[in-house]
Every structure is written in C-alpha cells, then in structure tokens.
C-alpha cells in the first residue's frame, strides 16, 4: 500500500513540471519554471478593465521581448466566464504571436464570440516565442473581454479595427502586481507612458515565494529611458489574513478559473485600485514619487478546491462579516511554489485593523488626513433586499465607495478621490457626490463607473480655462498630473489673447460701448458735401472718419462678444449632451443586465433595440475652436504689419510712385513737343 501511494505521488509530482518557457534577461540559459499561480475568478464583480502599456516600442518584434510579455502553456484549454455587465474599453490590443516557424500560437475563436466592446486606442503587438510549445495565455487573472464572454485566450484571427475591439480585464486582486521569476537584475526600459508604472523583482530572494516579487513604484514624466534602482528590498514581512466563514455559492464555483501564467519582467503602467491597500494609500498621500516597496503576499499551504475558489472572495466576506472572522498572521512559506492570493487587505473597511510596513512610513498627520478623507468619502451602507445569490449582495456592499478611473490613453484603473486641494476641487467633489448618489441608488453595477469616466474624444484647446477637469488619482504626483492626459476635460470658459492696443476686446459683458451710432442718409450726404469746402471740409471729413472708426470698433467688439457667448453656450451644451449620452449608455447597460434572464433587450424589443448614440463631441469642439480662431483674427493699427506693398503705407507709396511717373511722362511729352516744334519751325 505504501509503495502504491509513493508511486502515485511521484507521478503527480512529475506531472507538475513543465517545459522551459521563459528566458531571464541576465542569464543566457533558459530557466525551468514549474510553479503554478493558483488564482480564481469568483464572479464578474471581481474584475474590471485595465489598460496597460508595454515597455519599449509598441510593436515587440524581438523574440525575447515577446516571450517576456506573454505566458505560454501547453495543453491548457481556454476558460470562459460569463460577463454580462459590459465595459467600454479605452486601450485595446491586436495580438499576433507565432513560433519561429511562423505558426500562430493563438487558438481559433468559438463561433459564438463576437467583437465587444468599443475601444478608443488600439495597439498592435507582434512577436515570436521560441520557447512556446502550445497555445498562448495571458497573465494569471487577466482576461480578454468579448461579447458577454471573458476569456483567458486571445483568439487567432480576431484582428479588430477602431471602435470594435476586445478589451483586457484583470482580477482586482492582482491588477497592480507584476510577476517575475528568479529575479536576476533589471533591464533598461524605454518608457512609453507618462504615468507611474510598476515593476517587480525578487531582489535578494533565492526562491520565488508565490507568483510575484517585491513591488516598486517609479515615476516617469519625460519618456526617457530609466533603469530602476538595484537596491535590494527589505525581507518580506508577515501580513494578517482574514479567513471568510461563508462557503462558495454555485455561481462562484461556476465562474471559477485557474489559468496559469509564467511572465518575467513585464512592465505595465497605470496600475492601481479603487480599494487600495494601506501602504499604497500612504505612498499616494505623500505624492513624492519615491520608491515604495510592497512585501510579497504570504503563500499559504495548498488547500482544497473549495479554498482555491474562495481566495478572491475574502474581501467581500471580510467587509460584510467583520465580526465573524478570525484574524491570523501566517508567515510566508518560501519552500512552496504555489500561492493562493488573498484580497483581505484590499478592503477599505479593514484599514483600521492593518498596519503599514516599516519601509512605507509617512507623516502621521498625512496618514490621519488620508484616513479621514477615506472615511468621509465612503457613503453609508445601504440595506439591500435579500437576493437569490448572496455572493452578489456581498460584492455590492464592497463597491459602494465612489471611485474614479485614472486617465490614460493606454490604461485605466480606479483610485480614491484626491485628498490634495486644487483649483478644481469643488467641481470634483460635486461630481463625485452626484456619482455617489447614483451608486447608493443603483448599488449593483460596479463596472458602470468606467462609463461615467468615459473620456471625451477631444483635447482641450489652447488659451482655455478648464473649470471641470477630472484628470488624476490620489496616487499621482503633482509633476505627474501635469503630463497625464485628462480623463474628463470640459472647457467651459474661453480666455482669448488680449491686446492693450484695442479699445474694445469683447471679453466681458460690459466692455463694449452701449451707444452704437447709425448714420442716416442725410448725414452721409451732408458729410460728403461739406468735404468739398476748402479748409473746412477736411475737418468735417476727419470727424466723420473718427465716428466711422468708433462705430467699426464697437461692431467688432459686439461680434467678438457674440462669438464668445456662442462658444460658451456650445461648450455648455456639449457638456450636457455628453453627460446625457453617458447616462443613456449606463441605463442601457442596466436594462440589458435586468433583462438577461429573458434573453436581453433585443430579445424583448426585437429590432427596435438597436441604438447608436453617436459621439459628436469632436465635431462640436472643432466648430468651437474655429469660432475662437476666427474671432482672434483681427487687424489693429495703421496696417504697418506684413509686406510693405500690401500695407496701407505701401498703397500710398505705390500711388506716389505712379504720380511721379505720370509727372515724368508729362515732362517728357512736353520736352518732346518743344523739340518737335523747334525742328519744324
């Protein structure tokens, strides 16, 4: 009996080993990676959209670069989970990965996979992987979003165009964690993003504990090549873990996935969460852009499939049942390579019970300020009616805090409201409060916040004052905010170039002359007649001309004021229509969600369900810009600018030259006549 058990154990251990699939940057020999990241996707509320940017160029044509950014496994089938909420992607990717022979490593898509949702920016990623032996899977916890399907596999032939693309969503537990294997040093990375990014390395650890190493934060603002510091991070510290007391539901077991991944030295930008951990919040409040270290999550002993299916649900259970949980600290187990990642520290309600690591110590006043801001920003819990799925109820209680998505053309993530006051604080607080009311009323659509933060597809024009700007998160530094692209930017007040030489600018309501003189026909005739009187006529003509100039300036002033008022009105209208479009999409997604059990909205309404709310914000903004440019085109002074022959003095000069030529011709003719008469006489 013992021999049989030993033989079975050897077979199981031998089956865990895989082929070498990754190559370390500072080592010429491939490394055997046989550890498996055990993670599950409990339900659709546990994932959200995250855009990312590869370090280096957007097209990774190097085999080594491609192998560093994608994990490949042999014999791992694609896993699909239901995803019904829908998401509007911001940055998406067309992927083409082949082996050295040119054979595609991506699977053919199922027949029921459609392109969904829409995307703002598309990057094309190409490359080869000499170590791949099968299909290509993305990072553990990462999924490509199609129509109502979130798949771990990027399918072959799904090359999308602008406005119709698959998105990438990632598990909240690891959306800011980058995995590395046996850290052998750092590589120089050419940054393609202006926001902070995250990289990971095991530092001095000789054995990778779990699926990720120490997390560092770096700031990049000038697209320059940076090499992270090689200072070894402090040893990992034990962190408390809250164990849930509830059991998984049928829905969680249905949506459980356990994709495998092996990815080394992958760099991403814009990682963050609306439910940041305590040490991340402390570093975000300081806003100094300094390097912060995140200790690796301890690796508990492998448990039953039930335990593996519950690891992502720790935060929800810890949020709703704090009084029924037991907090125990478990040290890391470096000898084991399998990690069950817990999300107990991602809940804001647990911040008071956790302590920050020593290396992330900040000013106590700053920490207390951050804690107060988080307490005041979190709305009160709303009592929900009992539902059929208790897991959904727990997840909705965990997503009540109003969050915003950090703006980036290549990424998007949820962060806490900023605690640093600025010129737009009141507008930000007002909009977030309005969204907070929406969250308390809806309380079941945690992913609709991405639609609220949908970027307006135009850039702020120069010479504008942005009074409604929701741009950066609390984790971004001041220098970083200056370079980050805004998430919502509405220009509501126009400030044109002013010139001290103009009498009336038309910028304000009362800077134009109220008396606009309209000359009558008799006055015109009288002025024309009096102008012929010697000595007296030129004076009358001068007064008449001065009156015309004053009237002209007043008309120009009023036209400029009208243009400014029109531009402001259009901008206000653009803001209203943009918000109406956003909330219309939110309502449509909510209706689709409610009618899912009956086959969706199109099943109920038929062909009438097809709607297309076109986003014309760019066209309207272009018209506003054109109005402002036309309004700024003005000519002042006596026409001394430009080329001399086209100016007023140039015209007078040309007339003088013509007069001199005429006089010269007359003199020449007179001389010719005299000479001719002299010879005849």
From Swiss-Prot:
Changing residue 370 to V: In strain: Isolate Sanchez. One of its GO terms (cellular component) is membrane. Glycans are attached at residues 94, 171, 190, 202, 207, 219, 223, 255, 310, 313, 326, 337, 344-345, 350, 360, 397, 408, 422, 487, 564, 619. InterPro entries: Ebola-like_HR1-HR2, GPC_FiloV, GPC_filovir-type_extra_dom, TLV/ENV_coat_polyprotein. Residues 529-549 are annotated as: Fusion peptide. The keyword Transferase does not apply. Residues 19-648 are extracellular. Pfam families: Ebola-like_HR1-HR2, Filo_glycop. Residues 277-455 are annotated as: Mucin-like region. Residues 221-424 are annotated as: Disordered. Residues 304-313, 335-347, 415-424 have a biased composition (Low complexity). SUPFAM superfamilies: Virus ectodomain. N-glycosylated. Coiled coil: none annotated. Keywords: Cleavage on pair of basic residues, Disulfide bond, Fusion of virus membrane with host endosomal membrane, Fusion of virus membrane with host membrane, Glycoprotein, Host cell membrane, Host membrane, Host-virus interaction, Lipoprotein, Membrane, Palmitate, Signal, Transmembrane, Transmembrane helix, Viral attachment to host cell, Viral envelope protein, Viral penetration into host cytoplasm, Virion, Virus entry into host cell. CDD domains: Ebola-like_HR1-HR2. The chain crosses the membrane at residues 649-669. Residues 246-260, 278-290, 314-330, 348-371, 389-414 have a biased composition (Polar residues). A lipid is attached at residues 671, 673 (S-palmitoyl cysteine). Residues 38-188 are annotated as: Receptor-binding. The coiled coil regions play a role in oligomerization and fusion activity. Homotrimer; each monomer consists of a GP1 and a GP2 subunit linked by disulfide bonds. The resulting peplomers (GP1,2) protrude from the virus surface as spikes. GP1,2 interacts with human CD209 and CLEC4M (collectively referred to as DC-SIGN(R)). Asialoglycoprotein receptor (ASGP-R) may be a liver-specific receptor for GP1,2. Members of the Tyro3 receptor tyrosine kinase family may be cell entry factors interacting with GP1,2. Filoviruses entry requires functional lipid rafts at the host cell surface. Essential for infectivity, as it is the sole viral protein expressed at the virion surface. PANTHER family: VIRAL ENVELOPE PROTEIN (PTHR10424). GP1 is responsible for binding to the receptor(s) on target cells. Interacts with CD209/DC-SIGN and CLEC4M/DC-SIGNR which act as cofactors for virus entry into the host cell. Binding to CD209 and CLEC4M, which are respectively found on dendritic cells (DCs), and on endothelial cells of liver sinusoids and lymph node sinuses, facilitate infection of macrophages and endothelial cells. These interactions not only facilitate virus cell entry, but also allow capture of viral particles by DCs and subsequent transmission to susceptible cells without DCs infection (trans infection). This is Envelope glycoprotein.
